[in-house]
């Protein structure tokens, strides 16, 4: 798929009517906050986001514009990839953590959504394609995870701690990929806002670069 070729045949207004902007979500705002900010800044009727990120979680948050909002349902089950830091509450080696992961937390797993989640707390099956330890610093472990959409990483970390009988919790998390969208193609809010201001002043060059035709 040649996105640039697709863009050539569309006006900026057509892209805004049926396009997607891959936002690099900062920490603290909710996913809805980001979606609403994009809507108000662009002056479009409707926006929606592909896969919710907790307020403290950063990274890839594709925002659908107007008619593209109908596509969000098709992206919910897409694989997601994360990099994060977890703290294990006891002294353990990388090898011990990797052993526990390989025994219980790769492939098809059972997971119950956390208490704070908005979905029904019912056990469900999810697939973990990758859960790797990248680095260790004291009791803090940097990890990479590639999972089926709808997998709760915070719960994955907590369940790992329970399984090891050490306890564990997540310190930081960043989504680096959501389906076909990755962080290399994401746009921070400062650059987005600047591009919209330029568009409103008659220069749509930077904004066009940011919109992916749906």
Predicted ranges, named:
Residues 1-58, 64-212:
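Non-catalytic RNA-recognition surface used by pseudouridine synthases
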């Amino acid at each position: 798929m040649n996105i640039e070729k697709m863009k050539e045949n569309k006006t900026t207004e057509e892209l805004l009517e049926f396009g997607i902007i891959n936002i690099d979500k900062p920490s603290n705002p909710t996913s809805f906050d980001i979606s609403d900010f994009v809507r108000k800044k662009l002056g479009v009727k409707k926006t929606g986001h592909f896969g919710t990120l907790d307020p403290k979680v950063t990274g890839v948050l594709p925002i659908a514009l107007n008619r593209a909002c109908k596509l969000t349902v098709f992206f919910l089950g897409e694989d997601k990839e994360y990099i994060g830091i977890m703290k294990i509450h006891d002294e353990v080696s990388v090898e011990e953590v990797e052993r526990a992961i390989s025994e219980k937390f790769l492939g098809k797993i059972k997971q119950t959504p956390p208490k704070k989640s908005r979905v029904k707390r019912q056990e469900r099956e999810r697939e973990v394609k990758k859960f790797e330890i990248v680095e260790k610093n004291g009791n803090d472990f940097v990890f990479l995870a590639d999972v089926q959409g709808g997998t709760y990483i915070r719960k994955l970390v907590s369940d790992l701690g329970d399984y090891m009988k050490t306890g564990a919790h997540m310190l930081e998390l960043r989504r680096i990929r959501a389906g076909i969208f990755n962080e290399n193609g994401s746009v921070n809010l400062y650059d987005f806002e600047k591009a919209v201001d330029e568009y409103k002043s008659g220069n749509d060059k930077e904004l066009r670069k940011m919109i992916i035709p749906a």
